[in-house]
């Protein structure tokens, strides 16, 4: 079984500029999910939405082409792709000739499908569409307005509680203070998070302190979002819950996981100012 420690993270890597799908390094989701009590079918839906900002290849005459790519990996997939391997894989397109962007798109789709064990979505955008890529902050009431004392810097779910004796509410809360660290290298990962729910009102001070408590925690983006979802779901017992995080890019890639308790359309993959 592939483990994060066997990946290229934190190691010197040769940059290959001829297409090589074997560079992709899948990691099973199951082990980290078991840590948060998720075995079998997960109690959530959603996807991991990737944006690739450094995609380039050669056309059939050797002229470089560039594009952005949006890749959507369903959370039902048994595997994720380790992000450095994804970067190295995309770099392998650099001196490889493809007939057109569709050929590139279909090649990426087939390779990521095989790596994660599920069907993924891939969309490419050429330079003529770059100015249509908007920038927008997460909608909702900012928790960051609260003046709270923070003393926990590893996940502290005991900070979460809700007003079970009060009428239920519908709320969307956001924070730009999410930070965790790469599971293998310990490098900082910076993110913003949006939590939407229906049910007993969640104490906002405790929720903000809980989100801050990820600050020294080592885990991949997808795993952090699932941990947040499960902690809020079990401790605050909402009727409905969605957790959406957008992380700043590294190596030309950003990862934006979304998890929800009920089937719904994915949020638009619109980058934030920090991305």
UniProtKB/Swiss-Prot annotation:
Keywords: Cytoplasm, NADP, Oxidoreductase, Queuosine biosynthesis. Its EC number is 1.7.1.13. It catalyses: 7-aminomethyl-7-carbaguanine + 2 NADP(+) = 7-cyano-7-deazaguanine + 2 NADPH + 3 H(+). Substrate binds at residues 81-83, 221-222. Its main location: cytoplasm. GO terms for cellular component: cytoplasm. GO terms for molecular function: preQ1 synthase activity. It is found in: Cytoplasm. The active site is at residues 182, 189. It is an enzyme of class 1 (oxidoreductase). It holds the Pfam family QueF. One of its GO terms (biological process) is queuosine biosynthetic process. NADPH binds at residues 83-84, 250-251. Pathway: tRNA modification; tRNA-queuosine biosynthesis. The keyword Oxidoreductase applies. Belongs to the GTP cyclohydrolase I family. QueF type 2 subfamily. PANTHER family: NADPH-DEPENDENT 7-CYANO-7-DEAZAGUANINE REDUCTASE. Homodimer. Catalyzes the NADPH-dependent reduction of 7-cyano-7-deazaguanine (preQ0) to 7-aminomethyl-7-deazaguanine (preQ1). This is NADPH-dependent 7-cyano-7-deazaguanine reductase. It comes from Polaromonas sp. (strain JS666 / ATCC BAA-500). The gene is queF.
């Amino acid at each position: 079984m592939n483990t994060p420690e066997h990946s290229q993270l934190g190691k010197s890597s040769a940059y290959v500029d001829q297409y090589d799908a074997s560079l992709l390094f899948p990691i099973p989701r199951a082990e980290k999910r078991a840590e948060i009590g998720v075995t079998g079918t997960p109690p959530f839906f959603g996807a991991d939405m990737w944006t690739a900002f450094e995609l380039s290849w050669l056309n059939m005459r050797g002229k470089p082409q560039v594009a952005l790519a949006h890749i959507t990996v369903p959370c039902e997939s048994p595997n994720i792709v380790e992000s450095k391997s994804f970067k190295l894989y995309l770099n392998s397109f650099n001196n490889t000739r493809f007939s057109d962007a569709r050929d590139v798109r279909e090649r990426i789709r087939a390779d990521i499908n095989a790596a994660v064990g599920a069907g993924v979505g891939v969309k490419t955008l050429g330079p003529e569409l770059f100015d249509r890529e908007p920038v927008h902050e997460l909608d909702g009431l900012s928790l960051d307005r609260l003046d709270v004392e923070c003393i926990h810097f590893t996940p502290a779910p005991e900070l979460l509680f809700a007003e079970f004796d009060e009428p239920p509410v519908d709320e969307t809360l956001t924070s730009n203070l999410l930070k965790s660290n790469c599971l293998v290298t310990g490098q900082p990962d910076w993110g913003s998070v949006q939590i939407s729910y229906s049910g007993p009102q969640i104490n906002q001070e405790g929720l903000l302190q809980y989100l801050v408590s990820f600050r020294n925690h080592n885990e991949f983006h997808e795993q952090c979002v699932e941990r947040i979802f499960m902690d809020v779901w079990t401790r605050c017992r909402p009727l409905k819950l969605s957790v959406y995080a957008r992380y700043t890019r590294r190596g030309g890639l950003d990862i934006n996981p979304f998890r929800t308790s009920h089937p719904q359309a994915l949020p638009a993959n619109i980058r934030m100012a920090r991305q």
